[in-house]
């Protein structure tokens, strides 16, 4: 093996930045994207805190917790690009903010059907929350049987130099509804699974039965 002198190694190191140099425009976009995603993450934290406070309050007042679990996610970059492309919208940060209401998402899993309407009503009444839209897929299920209560809300997030309203999609459902939705989603990507349609239909039926108790 031929060894290189220290001078040769030093010269090769100096040349590396020139080889992997990233365009300034791309770096600026990456920084802006990172900042916007941070803002959505903070908005999720605000919304989760609101539901956690309500859950604590109701556990004392009613001696039980109506909320079993709170999940959250920020949409992945590839999912954002695919959704904007599908809608025929430009792939820009401005387009994402204007056209997508579900970049930030919070899912609230409740014990019973009545809990969904109770906690959603309490959130809607908070004076710093703006309701953008509501879709009740419990009273009006989707064709595939999907049931859930969807809210697009706008919540203020306080940063060091400003107050920024941010949109968050909130999905509220029971444990049974969440299990069925999760199974249905998995089977969409597992078409070869024997008896897939039967499994979904059975789970959907059981979800309705459980929610009626």
Labelled PLM ranges:
Residues 172-202:
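Flexible glycine-rich active-site/ligand-binding loops centered on an Asp-His dyad
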Residues 203-210:
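Conserved small/polar residues in nucleotide/adenosyl-binding loops
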Residues 104-110, 170:
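Short cationic amphipathic helices and targeting signals
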């Amino acid at each position: 093996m031929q060894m290189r002198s220290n001078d040769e190694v030093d010269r090769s190191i100096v040349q590396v930045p020139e080889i992997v140099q990233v365009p300034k425009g791309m770096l600026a976009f990456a920084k802006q994207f990172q900042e916007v995603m941070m803002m959505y993450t903070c908005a999720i934290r605000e919304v989760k805190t609101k539901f956690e406070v309500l859950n604590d309050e109701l556990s004392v007042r009613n001696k039980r917790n109506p909320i079993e679990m709170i999940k959250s996610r920020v949409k992945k970059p590839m999912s954002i690009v695919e959704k904007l492309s599908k809608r025929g919208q430009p792939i820009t940060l401005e387009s994402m903010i204007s056209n997508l209401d579900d970049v930030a998402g919070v899912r609230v899993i409740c014990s019973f059907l009545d809990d969904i309407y109770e906690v959603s009503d309490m959130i809607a009444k908070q004076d710093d929350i703006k309701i953008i839209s509501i879709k009740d897929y419990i009273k009006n299920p989707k064709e595939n049987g999907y049931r859930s209560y969807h809210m697009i809300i706008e919540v203020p997030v306080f940063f060091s130099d400003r107050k920024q309203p941010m949109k968050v999609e909130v999905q509220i459902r029971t444990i049974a509804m969440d299990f069925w939705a999760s199974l249905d989603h998995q089977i969409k990507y597992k078409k070869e699974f024997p008896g897939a349609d039967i499994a979904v239909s059975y789970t959907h039926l059981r979800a309705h039965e459980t929610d009626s108790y």
